[in-house]
Amino acid sequence: MAETFLFTSESVNEGHPDKLCDQISDAVLDACLEQDPDSKVACETCTKTNMVMVFGEITTKANVDYEKIVRDTCRTIGFISDDVGLDADKCKVLVNIEQQSPDIAQGVHGHFTKRPEEVGAGDQGHMFGYATDETPELMPLTHVLATKLGSRLTEVRKNGTCAWLRPDGKTQVTIEYYNENGAMVPVRVHTVLISTQHDETVSNDQIAADLKEHVIKPVIPEKYLDEKTIFHLNPSGRFVIGGPHGDAGLTGRKIIIDTYGGWGAHGGGAFSGKDPTKVDRSGAYVVRQAAKSIVANGLARRCIVQVSYAIGVPEPLSVFVDSYGTGKIPDREILQIVKENFDFRPGMITINLDLKRGGNSRFLKTAAYGHFGRDDPDFTWEVVKPLKWEKPQA
């Protein structure tokens, strides 16, 4: 057997305080875009015991009831009493929203006068997109499994299968891989870790049994589990206090969970609460589409794409491609194909990926369980573009 290594990714589910904040910020974005597709939104959220605050810069024609959005989002997640960490109907809601800075507005969109191809990047920064052929989603298996475990925890809480569950929870998966000439091949699941909030009545034995039967079994393919797989199920022994009561929450604190679970790279910019002129979001979405399209079209088994911007400038400063040695043609040729097939100007990304369209909880859906690898028509950046290329003669 080839030499193997261990790699780990984590996830948190929708009741985690940081993820609660991401979801509120994106619910606000959805509400603004639904009424006014040209809304400029930079919405942050923070939370602690019995309090949620939304703050930031929003310029919109939309009539938005921020307090209602906060309470509805908290309620939908399951924060319906102080016992579970927050009471959606009784908590304090603070709102401190101002207009977008006129300095930024004139530089980016000329106070709404610029044509789409002339819209400048909303800020400087660099973003990465990643794809790998180890799963059908073209995402890392560690990240896919950690995310699906978190999603499944929420499912069995809401459908009553495990009535003792509460909204907050974290998951983590370690996988043994081998490196096949630059491509990642999963061998087995080494460790599964779940820490979930629970009510006072349930025993640790029942927690472990239910998690194995109702969460792990339906999510992790049997072929990856063996007698050596390690399970850490609520290893701290008690997790009754959770949500904002247990920990403060803040938008943009879970950027690796939102992306590739530690694989690839990250430029540092968060997604939630940002309209598409913010290249932290739109730039990261288009380079995911580029990386995914490279792998799906057979140009490489694994690949990373970087793009960078200057505030107020439409054209990217740089585009970079690395296929980790898995490319069927040289990386410089893959880069050329990427530049010919993808328009990295923010205004054009917005049009090509239809990013001004709110409603249908479109961006709210991205704010829990990952922005990438999702099978949902609203995730337009997951659509593979056909790329024309010629296989080199053998």
Curated annotation (Swiss-Prot):
Protein name listed in UniProt: S-adenosylmethionine synthase
PROSITE patterns: ADOMET_SYNTHASE_1, ADOMET_SYNTHASE_2
Entry's Gene Ontology molecular function annotations: ATP binding; metal ion binding; methionine adenosyltransferase activity
Alphabetical list of Pfam families matching this protein: S-AdoMet_synt_C, S-AdoMet_synt_M, S-AdoMet_synt_N
Necessary cofactors: Mn(2+); Mg(2+); Co(2+); K(+)
EC number: 2.5.1.6
Gene from which the chain derives: METK
Binding site for L-methionine: 57, 100, 247, 278
Gene3D superfamilies the record matches: 3.30.300.10
Cofactor binding notes: Binds 2 divalent ions per subunit. The metal ions interact primarily with the substrate. Can utilize magnesium, manganese or cobalt (in vitro). Binds 1 potassium ion per subunit. The potassium ion interacts primarily with the substrate.
GO biological process, one term: S-adenosylmethionine biosynthetic process
Complex and partners: Homotetramer.
Binding site residues for Mg(2+): 10
Role this protein plays: Catalyzes the formation of S-adenosylmethionine from methionine and ATP. The reaction comprises two steps that are both catalyzed by the same enzyme: formation of S-adenosylmethionine (AdoMet) and triphosphate, and subsequent hydrolysis of the triphosphate.
Biological pathway: Amino-acid biosynthesis; S-adenosyl-L-methionine biosynthesis; S-adenosyl-L-methionine from L-methionine: step 1/1
Origin organism lineage: Eukaryota, Viridiplantae, Streptophyta, Embryophyta, Tracheophyta
Residue numbers binding K(+): 44
Family: Belongs to the AdoMet synthase family.
